[in-house]
């Protein structure tokens, strides 16, 4: 099967024929009626969708009827809604989901029932005791089904109520509920990089199969069919996240062709992790429909190509107030003393990315600097000039767990205190006056 982006432009992500609409002049397929996109009329919501298309005219009628069902808005006919329960799988990076009917629209996750799944099929439980329980934690509008349907971010527990090992949200929620942390109102802005791959050849989108494009330089924030690959996916994801209620704040093409970035935030506390996981789920669904593979590998292509990170911008209330630069420097000092702990928690395969090249610091050495993208921690010139603001932790890999990274930043900079001796030695080494 093929898919086509269903908007007012021509062409699409995969496939360019539009069977089922009849033919216009010169054999060109006729444009389909505007209809409904993701369950909402186009007039009501100007956004991009993906249409399911057949490979040949013999199945046109079936595909048209299926698309009508996919686009159907059930709101006028029933109060029932569809809730898509989403959770992190056994690898700690894969996402799983399944759907259930809820009797009426809901506004808060506390209104939703717990559910269960077969943990032996996700690598999260043994076959003889396979039940894992889903606890609904956050709700987003469903951009695929529209209407009152929802996406539900869940975390995972044993039947006895204990968090399973891949449940990183539970630990993060404990840290973010600490009074010392809540009083500091921690803000996070996360830059999620990702790479789009051709499905059948496992090679970046826009790259010649078995070959390489021209060197890096022309692709960052570029326009043009020879420099930008996958913009429809990035734009569809952007709009879908806005519709869902995710705090997405921007997108851009990245340095390596076929690689993109979007930013989520500022988000407070545990919300940062919920919004990143929900945004990843939506991106995975869109690439699924587009016939393109999404990878969060931090170094998908070896050689003179940029890796993929998940830079995490962070501030506390004290950092954002007058005199905040001194608080930022104290936070940097603490982060330097726990560098190994953070690196171990910042994503799989990060050693292939943090080489000291391609806008990264060395994985084994902690460093900081103003406007220096080759450091572990970067401070912006605006923060330096104003004497307050935020820091950017450039170490996290694109496949990092956002619950782990955000909670660890808060713990290290707010709750943890080094010994005076260790603090003095680190301050001298980093040339920090705190």
Swiss-Prot record:
Listed InterPro entries: Gln_synt_N, Gln_synt_N_sf, Gln_synth/guanido_kin_cat_dom, Gln_synth_cat_dom, Gln_synth_gly_rich_site, Gln_synth_N_conserv_site, Glutamine_Synthetase
Keyword Iron-sulfur attributed: no
Native species: Hordeum vulgare
Keyword DNA-binding: no
Family designation: Belongs to the glutamine synthetase family.
Protein name: Glutamine synthetase leaf isozyme, chloroplastic
Signal peptide coordinates: none
Presequence range in chain numbering: 1-54
Purpose of the protein: The light-modulated chloroplast enzyme, encoded by a nuclear gene and expressed primarily in leaves, is responsible for the reassimilation of the ammonia generated by photorespiration.
Catalytic activities: L-glutamate + NH4(+) + ATP = L-glutamine + ADP + phosphate + H(+)
The protein's assembly and partners: Homooctamer.
GO CC term, one of those recorded: chloroplast
Sequence segments annotated as region (Disordered): 1-33, 101-126
Keyword field: ATP-binding, Chloroplast, Ligase, Nucleotide-binding, Plastid, Transit peptide
Root EC class: ligase
PROSITE patterns per the UniProt record, alphabetical: GLNA_1 (PS00180), GLNA_ATP (PS00181), GS_BETA_GRASP (PS51986), GS_CATALYTIC (PS51987)
